């Protein structure tokens, strides 16, 4: 059976709009949501924001790649980075747990970090077993590697906060990063490990479509083989359409198609989804995937995973200031056909790694929510205890985080930036996503601890004020998730007390 997605809401919660709702429902007989919450949210959004500043802290993180590391070195450096970052912004350091907090924007421009290529950092367990000669060699292959976050000032579509870097320095840096991507992608054989390293801190918009196709495993690293692969896979997809799609009205499949048909108009952004051509494309993609994956079939939540791929691939052919306002009316039919096929295959590659999230009873999600609960109890016991005291269960808010990969918690532009990193990480959509969710929850520790009853806590957790988030917020969230991963990676009992 299909499990409910708790409190699903599109678009992500906007505290300015929600203020009206709170006032209109203030006379409910149940415990009211206090009006003070509105002003708190407004003040919270106007006075604070997250940013990963380019400065000396970047040098410390980059230096982590220069040598084989053990867990003590990793944790000491990462903690120092976050502590120094907090002190520069005048933000108090938490006594309980390493949770993320909002901080004021810097008043002065921080220095730009030096450019340079990064080396892979081995996992904690490998750092203990590596020989000195191997760790000192640039050419030494790594059996299990993970990407180090680069300087996170470069953001979605090559844009950033004007207050972080001067426009000239920013343009020069963007151009340099774009050039590195283009050189890697030009081949003749793209170095996928180097591409993952470079992509961790965000992919420039012009090269994002090809980079995603490579990182997802849809296209080969060899440049000469790519056109033939694209042609073959696109032809294969439309053979599925011809063979299966007419069966959508058969008795055995009509319930699946009906549910897809109902769910698509509920998706976000509405300006994109409600275009008839897009609706038809999404219906075909989801129906064909469900028919070809009978172990899970179609489950609510899978539909959301189509959108980022489709938007990224369509933006290769049209100019859109905001990804939420993409208009496909001027895109040739043949181009739309190719984008549809590419979207199907890339979404399929993603779901191959998390399919147990969507099989009967969704055991993958049940397990990950439990793991999140154990992890949060380790990293911030005060937040965990506060939720428990007010009888808020993780399943009531985190089920959606796992089911939709945080797509309903942050704007689409932030989801795309998040997926840049997920596709750069080993098991990014499953394993690393767990640490991102932990960092995301603890990020709101101050607001969580201020709420004193079940209703207000759950309302807040299901409607987090992220409508105005940008890539800086995602970059800091990813940096904290990366630190948590290093702290707990390869520890056999790291989810248990």
UniProtKB/Swiss-Prot annotation:
Residues 202-426 form the Rab-GAP TBC domain. Keywords: GTPase activation, Phosphoprotein. Pfam families: RabGAP-TBC. Transmembrane segments: none annotated. Gene3D superfamilies: putative rabgap domain of human tbc1 domain family member 14 like domains (1.10.8.270), Ypt/Rab-GAP domain of gyp1p, domain 1 (1.10.10.750), Ypt/Rab-GAP domain of gyp1p, domain 3 (1.10.472.80). Residues 83-147 are annotated as: Disordered. It comes from the Eukaryota. GO terms for molecular function: 14-3-3 protein binding; GTPase activator activity; protein homodimerization activity. The modification Phosphoserine is found at residues 112, 125, 147. Homodimer. Interacts with ACBD3 and ARFGEF1. Interacts with YWHAB, YWHAE, YWHAG, YWHAH, YWHAQ and YWHAZ. May act as a GTPase-activating protein for Rab family protein(s). This is TBC1 domain family member 22A. The lineage of its organism: Eukaryota, Metazoa, Chordata, Craniata, Vertebrata. The gene is TBC1D22A.
């Amino acid at each position: 059976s299909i499990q409910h997605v708790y409190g699903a809401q599109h678009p992500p919660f906007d505290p300015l709009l929600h203020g009206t709702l709170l006032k209109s429902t203030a006379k409910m007989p149940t415990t009211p949501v206090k009006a003070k919450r509105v002003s708190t949210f407004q003040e919270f959004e106007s006075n604070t924001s997250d940013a990963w500043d380019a400065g000396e802290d970047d040098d410390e993180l980059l230096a982590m790649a220069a040598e084989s590391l053990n867990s003590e070195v990793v944790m000491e450096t990462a903690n120092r980075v976050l502590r120094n970052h907090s002190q520069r912004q005048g933000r108090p350091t938490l006594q309980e747990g390493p949770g993320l907090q909002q901080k004021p924007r810097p008043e002065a421009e921080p220095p730009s970090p030096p450019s340079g290529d990064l080396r892979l950092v081995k996992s904690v367990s490998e750092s203990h077993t590596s020989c000195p000669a191997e760790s000192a060699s640039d050419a030494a292959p790594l059996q299990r590697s993970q990407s180090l976050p680069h300087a996170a000032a470069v953001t979605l579509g090559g844009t950033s906060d004007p207050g972080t870097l001067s426009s000239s320095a920013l343009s020069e840096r963007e151009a340099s990063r774009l050039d590195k991507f283009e050189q890697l992608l030009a081949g003749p054989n793209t170095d996928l490990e180097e591409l993952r390293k470079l992509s961790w801190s965000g992919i420039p918009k012009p090269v994002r479509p090809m980079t995603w196709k490579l990182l997802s495993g849809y296209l080969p690293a060899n440049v000469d083989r790519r056109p033939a692969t694209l042609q073959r896979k696109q032809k294969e997809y439309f053979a599925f359409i011809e063979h299966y799609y007419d069966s959508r009205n058969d008795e055995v499949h009509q319930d699946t198609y009906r549910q897809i048909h109902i769910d698509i108009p509920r998706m976000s952004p509405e300006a994109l989804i409600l275009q008839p051509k897009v609706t038809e494309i999404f219906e075909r993609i989801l129906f064909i995937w469900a028919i070809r994956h009978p172990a899970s079939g179609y489950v609510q939540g899978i539909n959301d995973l189509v959108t980022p791929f489709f938007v990224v691939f369509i933006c290769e052919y049209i100019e859109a200031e905001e990804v939420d306002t993409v208009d496909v009316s001027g895109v040739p039919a043949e181009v739309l056909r190719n984008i549809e096929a590419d979207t199907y295959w890339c979404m399929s590659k993603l779901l191959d790694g998390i399919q147990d999230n969507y099989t009967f009873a969704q055991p993958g999600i049940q397990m990950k929510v439990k793991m999140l609960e154990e992890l949060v109890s380790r990293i911030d016991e005060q937040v965990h205890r506060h939720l428990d005291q007010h009888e808020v269960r993780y399943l009531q808010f985190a089920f959606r985080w796992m089911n939709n990969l945080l797509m309903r918690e942050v704007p689409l532009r932030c989801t795309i930036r998040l997926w840049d990193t997920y596709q750069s990480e080993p098991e990014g959509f499953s394993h690393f996503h767990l640490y991102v969710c932990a960092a995301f929850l603890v990020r709101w520790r101050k607001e969580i601890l201020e709420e004193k009853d079940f209703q207000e806590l759950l309302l807040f957790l299901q409607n987090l004020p992220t409508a105005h988030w940008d890539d800086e917020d995602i970059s800091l969230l990813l940096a904290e998730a990366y630190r948590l991963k290093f702290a707990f990676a390869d520890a056999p009992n790291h989810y248990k007390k």
